[in-house]
Amino acid sequence: MGLEEKLPGGVLLASVEKLANWSRRSSLWPATFGLACCAIEMMSTGAGRYDLSRFGMEVFRASPRQADLMIVAGRVSQKMAPVLRQIYDQMPEPKWVLSMGVCASSGGMFNNYAIVQGVDHIVPVDMYLPGCPPRPEMLMDAIIKLHEKILAGPISGRIEHTKIGSSPYPKPIEVATARAGLPEGAFDTRTLSVNDRKRFSIPAGAPAPTGGGAVEPALDTRRPAALAPPSVFGRAKRIPVDPKPSDEARAHGPGPTTESIGDVDGPDRGI
């Protein structure tokens, strides 16, 4: 009827949350962080043929303090896990993680002691991208889906305050260590392979032994040092053993007073 008020041209109504998330989505700067073969496909995605600058991502920052997206491109070795976590901690919040390739997501073909069986044991992951390796088109599709997730998320983003080894996944080795009466920290849970986790696992709901109870059969109290994995930094370490073993350990035979564990590259170097 001509009585309605009309907004003048050039005025846009939006919430502060939508505006902040739109800005984050449109200027998502990845960190320069390549680990293995998937990094080649990530570099191809940033080249002129696919041109990530269309999505505001042409700048791969060399400093984690200027990046807000970590693309874990390739398998993560046990020695690289602390470095990866340190880079993640240096990134400003809010920040996001994209696990590129099956090796980064679940270990892939590297089902052994040297490779982390899933990067989500080290850092929280927002988007998983399968493939070996995934093509640049697949990486772009995963990035677009991550953009949609950022746009629909809260203004505070996903803020995490965790440390290495504080993954939400259960750590049965810690439970088994406590039940075996070994000192806290005798096992480094960061260096356990998937086979070791299965070896030391305890059935859910199993009652904890009381004083004088039997030790879990999955652990051998005669040689606790032999069960300890090597250091994550590759150095040999020594774990002292009580020279006066318990009655249960004595029934299995005498054990050594000190054992040496070699590094992952070879025999004990006496470090």
From Swiss-Prot:
The protein's Enzyme Commission number: 7.1.1.-
Cofactor mode of binding and number, as noted: Binds 1 [4Fe-4S] cluster.
Region listing for Disordered, in residue ranges: 227-271
Biological process, per Gene Ontology: aerobic respiration; electron transport coupled proton transport
Required cofactor(s): [4Fe-4S] cluster
GO cellular component, one term: respiratory chain complex I
Sorted UniProt keywords: 4Fe-4S, Cell membrane, Iron, Iron-sulfur, Membrane, Metal-binding, NAD, Quinone, Translocase, Transport
S-S bridge residues: none
Database matches in InterPro entries: NADH_UbQ_OxRdtase-like_20kDa, NADH_UQ_OxRdtase_20Kd_su
Binding site for [4Fe-4S] cluster: C37, C38, C103, C132
Similarity section: Belongs to the complex I 20 kDa subunit family.
PANTHER family: NADH DEHYDROGENASE, NADH DEHYDROGENASE [UBIQUINONE] IRON-SULFUR PROTEIN 7, MITOCHONDRIAL
Protein name: NADH-quinone oxidoreductase subunit B
Organism: Frankia casuarinae (strain DSM 45818 / CECT 9043 / HFP020203 / CcI3)
Originating gene: nuoB
